[in-house]
Amino acid sequence: VLAQLPEAVLEGDDGLRWQPLPTAAPEATASLLECRFAVVDVETTGRRAEQERITEVACVTIERGRITETFASLVNPGMPIPPPITALTGISDELVATAPPFAAIATELRQHLSQAVFVAHHASFDRKFLTAELRRADETFVWTAPTLCTVQLARYLVPGLDNYRLDTVTAHFRISNPARHRASGDALATAQLFLRLLERLIEQDIVAVDAVTALLAKQKRTTRRRPLPGEDRHHE
């Protein structure tokens, strides 16, 4: 399902120095001002990407500081959805019974991911699941796009919060999410959060993708710890 978002959501900040979009896939040295971003959220049957499956996926595209389009689809995982997952997300076996399998949406989803920096809240979780599903659909698939995690970005740019669950960080920025624990709602909230964090990076003159990834890698090494209660990806 491809959908245009309301005009109020699509409008960007004209005060930022956005540049024309590139035609090639983003390099690590690319400027944040030039990049296309694919902000993604997945809902799944569990935590292990190799054993579990995606039940819903959404991708929000950001170009030149504006949310321009969204893709969202329920996915038939081909396996039962555990009751605790249904209780959390509202996604049941009945809801996905007539949904397409992941392979049926893989090509369209790849179009949204192509030539884009991958962004997600707890990005390693979403990327592992997407990589596993995309490889099942096409065993030759290779994904080299840079990745930015809004959890790590928020820890660096908004220090001192009680935790960095999506609810907590979006509340800090007064971003609403009426569809919590559904891929479309969480992806849109994450995209709006990322735009706020992107503004702060640019204000600090951190404008290269590789500069951001290096900064986050350094921060991760110095702040490595066990997750706080409630920070588990399935209960964030």
PLM features: what roles do these ranges have?
Residues Q4-G15, T23-T29, L195-E236:
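Acidic two-metal-ion nuclease catalytic site recognized across multiple nuclease folds
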Residues Q19-E27, L33-T144, P159-Y164, T168-N177, ...:
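Conserved non-catalytic scaffold segment of RNase H-like nuclease domains
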Residues T44-G46, Q152, A189:
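Short, glycine/acidic-enriched loop or turn micro-motifs at the edges of active sites
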Residues V142-A154:
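Conserved beta-strand -> loop -> alpha-helix junction used to position metal-binding or nucleic-acid-contacting
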Residues R182-L195:
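Acidic, divalent-metal-coordinating active-site segment for phosphoryl/phosphodiester hydrolysis
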